[in-house]
C-alpha cells in the first residue's frame, strides 16, 4: 500500500509541473519571457477596448484640435462675410448719399421718426382723400388691384420727406375691399391714416375740395396746403369715361387734371396708345414729388410710365 501511494503522488507532482499545450518548453528565463509575451498578446486581442490612458489622451487631444481648427475656419469665414457686407453697404451709401437713412439709426428709431412725420402731416401737411365710394360694382380682380395700389400709395407716403395726410373715404370696414386690403397688405389695420364710411363731400367743406380727374378742363398748377385733393379710387377694366368728373360736377366741386399736356407730348408707339389715366399710387407719386421739388417735369417723370405713350418734351427725340 505504501508503494502505490508513493507512485500516485509522483504522478500527481509530474502533472502539476507539465508545460501547457502549445507553449515552448521552458528553457530558462528567455523561454519564460517569451511565454508571457504570447499570453499578453492574447489578452490584448480579446479586449481591444482596454487602451492605455496615454494613447487615449493623445487621441482625444488630436480630435479636439481638429474640431478647434474647424470651428476657427467657420468663425473666420463668417467674419469675412460680415466685413464684405459692411463694405458693400458702405459703397452703396457712398454712391447714393441722399437716400435719407443713417446706418447708426435702428429700425425702431426710423419707425418712430416715420410715425412722427405722419402725425405731423395730419395737423399741418397737405391732405389727400381717396374716394372709395365707387367700389360696389368692381370685380374681385379689380378690388385686388385697388388694394395693391393703396398699399403702394401708403408706402410712398411713408418714405416721403414731406408726407401728406391720407384719408380713405366712403370705406366701410365690412366691405369686400376692406377684407382684400387686410388680406393683401400686412399691417393694414395699423396704417397711420383716416378710414371713414363718410364720403368726401360730406366730410370736408366743398369749397376746399379739388377733384383730380383726367377729364377736367383745368390744369393743376400748384399744391396748396389748405386744399383737400381727391383721387377717385376706381379700377375699371372696361374704362368707363368721365366717371369721376361727373361725380365732381354733381356736387359742384372744383376739378383739375395733372399737367401732362403742358409738359409732355405723345410719343409714337406700335399700338398708337396714349392715356392720361393713372393708378392712384402713380397720381400720388406725382403730387408727392412735386410737393418736395416744385418741379413738374421731374414729378411727371416719376409717375407717368413710358407705357402711357407720353414723354417729357425735352426728351422726345430719344
UniProtKB/Swiss-Prot annotation:
Task: Report biased composition (Polar residues) as residue ranges.
Answer: 52-63
Q: What is its EC number?
A: 2.1.1.221
* Gene Ontology CC: cytosol; TIM22 mitochondrial import inner membrane insertion complex
Output compositional bias ranges, type Basic residues: 64-83
Q: Which reaction does it catalyse?
A: guanosine(9) in tRNA + S-adenosyl-L-methionine = N(1)-methylguanosine(9) in tRNA + S-adenosyl-L-homocysteine + H(+)
A Gene Ontology molecular function term of the record: tRNA (guanosine(9)-N1)-methyltransferase activity
Q: Does the keyword Coiled coil apply?
A: yes
Q: Which GO terms describe its biological process?
A: methylation; protein insertion into mitochondrial inner membrane
EC top class, in one word?
transferase
**Function as written in the Swiss-Prot or TrEMBL entry:** S-adenosyl-L-methionine-dependent guanine N(1)-methyltransferase that catalyzes the formation of N(1)-methylguanine at position 9 (m1G9) in tRNAs. Probably not able to catalyze formation of N(1)-methyladenine at position 9 (m1A9) in tRNAs.
Its recorded name reads tRNA methyltransferase 10 homolog B
| Gene designation per UniProt | Trmt10b
Amino acid at each position: 500500500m505504501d508503494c502505490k501511494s508513493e507512485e500516485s503522488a509522483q504522478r500527481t507532482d509530474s502533472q502539476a509541473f507539465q508545460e501547457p499545450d502549445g507553449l515552448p518548453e521552458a528553457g530558462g528565463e528567455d523561454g519564460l519571457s517569451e511565454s508571457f509575451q504570447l499570453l499578453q498578446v492574447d489578452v490584448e486581442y480579446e479586449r481591444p477596448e482596454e487602451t492605455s490612458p496615454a494613447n487615449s489622451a493623445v487621441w482625444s487631444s488630436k480630435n479636439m484640435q481638429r474640431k478647434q481648427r474647424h470651428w476657427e475656419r467657420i468663425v473666420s469665414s463668417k467674419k469675412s462675410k460680415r466685413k464684405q457686407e459692411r463694405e458693400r453697404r458702405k459703397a452703396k451709401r457712398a454712391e447714393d448719399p441722399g437716400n435719407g437713412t443713417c446706418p447708426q439709426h435702428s429700425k425702431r428709431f426710423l419707425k418712430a421718426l416715420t410715425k412722427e412725420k405722419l402725425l405731423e402731416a395730419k395737423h399741418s401737411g397737405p391732405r389727400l382723400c381717396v374716394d372709395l365710394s365707387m367700389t360696389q360694382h368692381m370685380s374681385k380682380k379689380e378690388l385686388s388691384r385697388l388694394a395693391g395700389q393703396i398699399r403702394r400709395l401708403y408706402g410712398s407716403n411713408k418714405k416721403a420727406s414731406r408726407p401728406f395726410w391720407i384719408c380713405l373715404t366712403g370705406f366701410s370696414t365690412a366691405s369686400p375691399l376692406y377684407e382684400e386690403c387686410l388680406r393683401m397688405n400686412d399691417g393694414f389695420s395699423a396704417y397711420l391714416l383716416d378710414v371713414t364710411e363718410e364720403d368726401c363731400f360730406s366730410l370736408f367743406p366743398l369749397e376746399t375740395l379739388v377733384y383730380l380727374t383726367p377729364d377736367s378742363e383745368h390744369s393743376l398748377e400748384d399744391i396748396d396746403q389748405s386744399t383737400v385733393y381727391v383721387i377717385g379710387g376706381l379700377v375699371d377694366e372696361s374704362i368707363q369715361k368721365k366717371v369721376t368728373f361727373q361725380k365732381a360736377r354733381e356736387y359742384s366741386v372744383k376739378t383739375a387734371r395733372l399737367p401732362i399736356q403742358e409738359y409732355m407730348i405723345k410719343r409714337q408707339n406700335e399700338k398708337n396708345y396714349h392715356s392720361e389715366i393713372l393708378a392712384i399710387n402713380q397720381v400720388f407719386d406725382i403730387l408727392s414729388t412735386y410737393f418736395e421739388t416744385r418741379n413738374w417735369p421731374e414729378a411727371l417723370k416719376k409717375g407717368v410710365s413710358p407705357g402711357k405713350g407720353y414723354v417729357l418734351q425735352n426728351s422726345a427725340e430719344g
